[in-house]
Swiss-Prot record:
Keywords, comma-separated and alphabetical: Cytoplasm, DNA-binding, Transcription, Transcription regulation
Swiss-Prot/TrEMBL GO biological process terms: regulation of DNA-templated transcription
GO MF term list: DNA binding
Compartment list: Cytoplasm
First-listed, main subcellular location of the protein, grouped into a coarse class: cytoplasm
PANTHER family reported in the protein's UniProt record: TRANSCRIPTIONAL REGULATORY PROTEIN YEBC-RELATED, TRANSLATIONAL ACTIVATOR OF CYTOCHROME C OXIDASE 1
Alphabetical list of InterPro entries matching this protein: Integrase-like_N, TACO1_YebC-like_2nd/3rd_dom, TACO1_YebC_N, Transcrip_reg_TACO1-like, Transcrip_reg_TACO1-like_dom3, YebC-like
Protein family according to the UniProt entry: Belongs to the TACO1 family.
Protein name per UniProt: Probable transcriptional regulatory protein PMT_1423
Superkingdom of origin: Bacteria
GO CC term, one of those recorded: cytosol
Length: 247
């Protein structure tokens, strides 16, 4: 698997800024509420358990988490959650494919905001299905190096030995741990299996990953693509963005 891209670095640094002004908490609350529609008990709702894990990792207050669960499961006195998950697709400069997952209570508003942002940055919002075939849904589990004994780094040999027993098909060692990859349907078993083997599981999620990546002709074009991705990520309704821009 390719290493972390410049876009990944932008997302990580931006997440810190967002957390300071509450934007991350708002997004996480939306994700929890949507997941809670299938049941407010995280023990029987893996999607909800995943969303709660993300919220806890971001240090979201427990009261905020409980309110989001209540809203999604219909227990909130102010009414049930009206959010819906929608996928949008489009093209960035140079034909870069962009896939956007949004949580919104107003499809028309979200589509208009996305279209304006694409146009402003040299891209175009496309029709459903125009780029989805260029991606595949994957499982990713993030391991902490704190569970390693080899100088605070994940032992590749130990990880490989453990992965032979699980439904994993790839991994990547990173500075503060490792990322384990698997098929879309394997996420629940993969994170549980790694935890049972003694690894510290910091997080897990379903992601869209490009089947192939494309590069830009020059630095200016690449910068334009990165600016588009960052602008899209700043929209309130946008939950997650994937692209096939080469690292």
């Amino acid at each position: 698997m390719a290493g972390h891209s410049k876009w990944s670095q932008i997302k990580r640094s931006k997440a810190v800024v967002d957390a300071k002004r509450g934007a991350v908490f708002t997004r996480l609350a939306r994700e929890i509420s949507v997941a809670a529609r299938s049941g407010g008990d995280p023990n029987g709702n893996f999607q909800l358990r995943t969303a709660i894990n993300k919220a806890k990792a971001a240090r979201m207050p427990a009261a905020n988490i409980e309110r989001a669960i209540a809203k999604g499961s219909g227990q909130d006195q102010n009414g049930a959650c009206q959010l819906e998950a929608i996928r949008y697709e489009g093209y960035g400069p140079g034909g870069v494919a962009v896939l956007i997952e949004a949580l919104t209570d107003n499809r028309n508003r979200t589509a208009a905001d996305l279209r304006l942002t694409f146009n402003k940055h040299g891209g175009k919002l496309g029709e459903s299905g125009c780029v989805a075939y260029l991606f595949e849904q994957r499982s990713e589990v993030y391991l902490s190096a704190q569970s390693a004994q080899d100088g605070g780094k994940v032992s590749e040999d130990a990880l490989l030995e453990n992965l032979l027993e699980l439904e994993a098909d790839g991994y990547q060692l990173i500075d503060d741990g490792a990322v384990v990859y698997g098929p879309f349907q394997a996420l629940e078993g993969l994170q549980a299996g790694l935890r049972d083997q003694g690894w510290i599981v910091e997080g897990w999620e379903h992601c869209w990953r490009p089947l192939t990546t494309i590069s830009q002709a020059d630095q200016k074009s690449e910068d334009q693509c990165l600016q588009l991705l960052e602008a899209l990520d700043e929209l309130d309704d946008v939950h997650h963005i994937s692209s096939n821009l080469e690292s």
